[in-house]
Amino acid sequence: MNKLIQSKLELLPTSPGCYIHKDKNGTIIYVGKAKNLRNRVRSYFRGSHDTKTEALVSEIVDFEFIVTESNIEALLLEINLIKENKPKYNIMLKDDKSYPFIKITNETYPRLIITRQVKKDGGLYFGPYPDVGAANEIKRLLDRLFPFRKCTNPPEKVCFYYHLGQCKAHTICQVDSQYFKDLAQEVAAFLKGQDDQIIEDLRGKMAGAAQTMEFEKAAEYRDLIQSIGTLRTKQRVMAKDLQNRDVFGYYVDKGWMCVQVFFVRQGKLIERDVNLFPYYNDPDEDFLTYIGQFYQEKSHLKPNEILIPADIDEEAVRAMVDTKVLKPQRGEKKQLVNLAIKNARVSLQQKFDLLEKSIEKTQGAIENLGQLLNIPTPVRIESFDNSNIMGTSPVSAMVVFVNGKPSKKDYRKYKIKTVVGPDDYASMREVIKRRYSRVIRDGLTPPDLIVIDGGQGQVNVAKEVIQEQLGLDIPIAGLQKNDKHQTHELLFGDPLQVVELSRNSQEFFLLQRIQDEVHRFAITFHRQLRSKNSFSSQLDGIEGLGPKRKQNLMKHFKSLTKIKEASVDEIVEVGVPRAVAEAVQEKLNLKTQEQQQARLREVAEPQAEIE
């Protein structure tokens, strides 16, 4: 589990919603739902799992989540996201089964059934649902509300369901087939969220039963009303009109704005776009600017309708986008906007929480490091590393970390001037003396800790210069690497000793970042210098081609290869006389031929045996 996931897990809300797992390429590999996002997402990274889930977890590099108002919203949002993104592990973990539907069969006396196959058989299909459990839960409620046929084979006498009021016993009692057609339409309306009339009828029956003192029956009606309230399928993540619309919501805090856009297609929320950025003007104005820029991108097609918060100028949006723009005040559309705003608030808060945790961890790391080494908190740390290959172009580099963060304006590069050949100790001695002589001379701020990328020899050389030659009192530590070139151990003290440091501690991670950064900075400088020297050496000795013209050539063509490929006329255009341009081409092409011939000789000649 990487540090980003570790931090985000601590900040998950306990709300229901959907979570979205991504791999190293940012591809969605799994979408899931949860009644409690915190508990569910954390469970992936704790304990043991079956083989398939272990494979999923091994690929997770990041995750996102969308908060919903209820678990049923999460169910429906999950299926929409899965259908849209087709994550590979959703297919694997569900054993390649298709999703369940609730079906009203096309029979004279229809039945309510659950099926995974949608056929053109005249039946009415509702769904799909994310799993059989969700479909069964809704079907059980429908069975109690609508008296469809329950039996596959007609019984000879009325069945148990008839006495429960859940069947009309059509084979025994005369029931008009039109009754079931009307019943099917009622179910369709109910599943589309048109349940107000049903609830009103149930309330009337409940009141009637209570008046006649049939309290058990009244309790049954009460339970039915509560079940509808729990399982009603009129969801904020679903729209009844099957319209294509974009829903905008935003939230601002501490100079930052988060904009969330929900993409509703055919009435279903299939995707969302999240963007966080600092705002500098009036939030409403910056939000308007964002919408205008949003639809300038070719990937964002204008929908039939845009929903925006109530405090935004709809005429301004309409002028920019030229489509229907609404500021809903109530109902389903208002709930969609509220959901977008809620998710914007959650995303922005998560950013601040992650930032705060990062600051806390970094501050804690430098404080703990000071305690570990028994020195004042090392607010400013300067670190050094040397780089050379077989003594060629030896360089050194210094990086600076202030309050645990890189201070790149303070980085310094050093060309080694007094050392001949690959002498790491002498190079370190030169650079430390140059750096801290200048600190003394110019009155610069000295560091609280010097970290040397190296072992005992390099650290002792640095201590000799700092303490004995310059008379400074600056703590010096060393970072040794293992045979895999990874940060291995911390050296400190007089005499130097290995400091016990947990590899999972924030102090270790801080030192590791410092060592990786100084190594990167040094080796990048060394490569740049070698490339420049190689370029200069191949162009040396050409009459009329001085340092300025060499620099202009490199600036224009970027590399020797590009210069070799250029024509004489193209070189002349850079400001090089034609005779000199011809000499450049001749020398570079001759050099290339010599290199090719040398490689051919190497292949042809037998290699010396290694003893």
From Swiss-Prot:
Belongs to the UvrC family. Residues 14-91 form the GIY-YIG domain. NCBIfam families: uvrC. Keywords: Cytoplasm, DNA damage, DNA excision, DNA repair, Excision nuclease, SOS response. GO terms for biological process: nucleotide-excision repair; SOS response. GO terms for cellular component: cytoplasm; excinuclease repair complex. It comes from Streptococcus gordonii (strain Challis / ATCC 35105 / BCRC 15272 / CH1 / DL1 / V288). InterPro entries: GIY-YIG_endonuc, GIY-YIG_endonuc_sf, GIY-YIG_UvrC_Cho, RuvA_2-like, UVR_dom, UVR_dom_sf, UvrABC_protein_C, UvrC. The UvrABC repair system catalyzes the recognition and processing of DNA lesions. UvrC both incises the 5' and 3' sides of the lesion. The N-terminal half is responsible for the 3' incision and the C-terminal half is responsible for the 5' incision. This is UvrABC system protein C. It is found in: Cytoplasm. Residues 196-231 form the UVR domain. The gene is uvrC. Pfam families: GIY-YIG, HHH_5, UVR, UvrC_RNaseH, UvrC_RNaseH_dom. One of its GO terms (molecular function) is DNA binding.
